[in-house]
């Protein structure tokens, strides 16, 4: 049974981590199927970590206390308060000391994997250029537009019934047609979208970001143009196209540093996977010989 397998303290720590990272919930909220899936993930992860920490490459690898403290602070930041973190630990019968110990183990595994990659060559400008020109479609930026004001429909409130909401936004639109430069001011006063505090600014959006009803209008608009009143499932909208950035191809110079980092990371991950496969195969062979 998964619940029996996950009874020890170490596994409870792993369960807390897997539940949040894989399923986005607390361990107690996992279904039986999810719990069994978590059990398989944990078993595989512990098997790999054990192999890594027993490998010759792990000899002499030490985690400095400052790195552990930084990682612990990162975990604590996910919770509203130290008390909330303690409650989460208590719910899984864990304590801070035990969790720190498991965190130190994770960090040491990561450090060993970093050491394994120490001899890898750096990604050269030629490597980056070849990837860029062979995958040019990955570096196309679609057209982007800026916009937005919203009045929601909510029949539970007299001021937000469908008829009242429509009247309000038509009044706003009439006001803006005379002075579109007042868009940000009107958005801050009347918009019920979270973007109101930024003057209704959605930022640069690409097709498919907004509701289809809004997309269909926005990407036909010219710079400085106001839309008619539009309706989506959440209410009425007026769009203002503040600017238009046409679709374009990013240059190699623009993306070279980020692409180099991406390719370097991909190379490291591929090498680590290859190293782990070899390590696990060697361990399996030794176990077979020992039991043969």
Swiss-Prot record:
Question: What keywords tag this UniProt record?
Answer: Isomerase, Nitrogen fixation, Rotamase
Instruction: Tell me which domain of life the UniProt entry assigns to the organism this sequence originates from.
Output: Bacteria
Extract the GO molecular function terms from the UniProt entry.
peptidyl-prolyl cis-trans isomerase activity
Q: Which GO terms describe its biological process?
A: nitrogen fixation
- Reaction catalysed by this enzyme: [protein]-peptidylproline (omega=180) = [protein]-peptidylproline (omega=0)
Q: What is its EC number?
A: 5.2.1.8
The record ties this protein, via Gene3D superfamilies, to: 3.10.50.40
Every PpiC domain range: 148-243
- Give the function comment from the record: Required for the activation and stabilization of the iron-component (NifH) of nitrogenase. Probable PPIase.
NCBIfam families membership = nifM_nitrog (TIGR02933)
Q: Which family does it belong to?
A: Belongs to the PpiC/parvulin rotamase family.
Protein name in UniProt: Putative peptidyl-prolyl cis-trans isomerase NifM
- What is the organism field in this record? Azotobacter vinelandii
């Amino acid at each position: 049974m998964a619940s029996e397998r996950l009874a020890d303290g170490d596994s409870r720590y792993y369960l807390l981590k897997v539940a949040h990272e894989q399923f986005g919930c607390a361990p107690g909220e996992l279904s039986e199927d999810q719990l069994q899936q978590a059990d398989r993930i944990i078993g595989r992860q512990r098997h790999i970590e054990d192999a890594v920490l027993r490998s010759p490459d792990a000899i002499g690898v030490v985690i400095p206390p400052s790195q552990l403290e930084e990682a612990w602070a990162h975990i604590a930041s996910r919770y509203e308060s130290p008390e909330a973190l303690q409650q989460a630990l208590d719910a899984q019968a864990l304590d801070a000391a035990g969790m720190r110990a498991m965190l130190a183990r994770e960090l040491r595994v990561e450090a060993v994997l970093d050491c394994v990659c120490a001899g890898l060559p750096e990604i050269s400008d030629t490597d980056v250029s070849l990837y860029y020109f062979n995958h040019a479609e990955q570096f196309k930026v679609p057209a982007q537009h800026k916009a937005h004001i919203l009045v929601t429909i909510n029949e539970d409130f007299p001021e937000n019934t469908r008829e009242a909401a429509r009247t309000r936004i038509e009044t706003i639109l009439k006001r803006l047609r005379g002075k579109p430069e007042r868009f940000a001011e009107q958005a801050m006063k009347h918009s019920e979208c979270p973007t109101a505090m930024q003057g209704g600014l959605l930022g640069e959006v690409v097709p498919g970001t907004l509701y289809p009803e809004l997309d269909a209008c926005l990407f036909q608009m010219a710079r400085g143009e106001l839309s008619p009143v539009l309706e989506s499932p959440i209410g009425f909208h007026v769009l203002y196209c503040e600017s238009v950035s046409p679709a374009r191809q990013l240059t190699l110079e623009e993306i070279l540093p980020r692409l180099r980092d991406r390719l370097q990371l991909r190379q490291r991950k591929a090498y680590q996977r290859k190293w782990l496969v070899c390590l696990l195969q060697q361990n399996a062979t030794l176990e077979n010989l020992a039991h043969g």
